[in-house]
């Protein structure tokens, strides 16, 4: 099943286009360590102007889709390398940059007549969501490097949590095995490597707790 990073950014329960009030408020509910919280806020703030810039390019209509994808990939690559403190992207991150660049541009062009799709609100929503994916992936890498052997899926436990995520809340598995979430499999919340359904990833606020025993 092909993953749709953006999936029009519509909440299937409300049918309304997604907005966030602030990055701090969005991430604080996830019970992240303070350093991780600040890192995610910083990354989202760095991603936001990149997507706003992209929307302006699309509205201006001066560049081909291929040219915009290339430019977007370059900007995302530099930002992600800074977040991970690396000099080159690994295969997972390279694939991620290519897919999100293609998908966000495709959806924006398709819906360019709707002001929301080129708005600051949408840029913020995408930035927050993609920050969570990148943050969750970084945590998984760090946990493996630090010798953790197991992981536990943690949902936010409120009325916004989708039932398929409630079903795996508290599930503990070996660190390299995937979770089965609805009709999808994921190594961590928002993981794209196994082509999950967008309904299981878009606006997901779940996180993992890693343990050695």
Functional labels for PLM-detected ranges:
Residues 1-142, 146, 210-213:
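N-terminal leader/targeting and assembly helices and adjacent pre-domain segments
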Residues 121-213:
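Acidic, glycine-rich two-metal-ion catalytic cores of nucleic acid-processing enzymes
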């Amino acid at each position: 099943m092909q993953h749709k990073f953006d999936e029009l950014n519509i909440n299937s329960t409300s049918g309304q286009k997604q907005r966030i009030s602030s990055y701090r408020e969005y991430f604080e509910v996830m019970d992240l360590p303070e350093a991780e919280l600040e890192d995610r806020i910083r990354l989202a703030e760095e991603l936001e102007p990149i997507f706003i810039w992209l929307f302006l390019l699309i509205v201006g209509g001066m560049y081909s889709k291929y040219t915009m994808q290339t430019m977007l990939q370059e900007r995302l690559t530099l930002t992600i390398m800074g977040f991970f403190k690396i000099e080159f992207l690994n295969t997972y991150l390279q694939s991620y940059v290519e897919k999100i660049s293609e998908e966000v541009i495709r959806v924006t062009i398709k819906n360019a007549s709707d002001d929301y799709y080129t708005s600051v609100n949408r840029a913020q929503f995408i930035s927050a969501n993609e920050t969570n994916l990148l943050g969750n992936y970084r945590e998984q890498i760090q946990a493996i490097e630090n010798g953790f052997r197991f992981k536990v899926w943690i949902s936010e436990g409120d009325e916004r949590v989708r039932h398929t995520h409630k079903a795996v809340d508290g599930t503990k598995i070996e660190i390299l095995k995937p979770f089965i979430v609805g009709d999808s499999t994921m190594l961590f919340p928002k993981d794209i490597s196994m082509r999950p359904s967008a309904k299981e990833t878009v606006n997901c606020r779940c996180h993992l707790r890693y343990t050695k025993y």
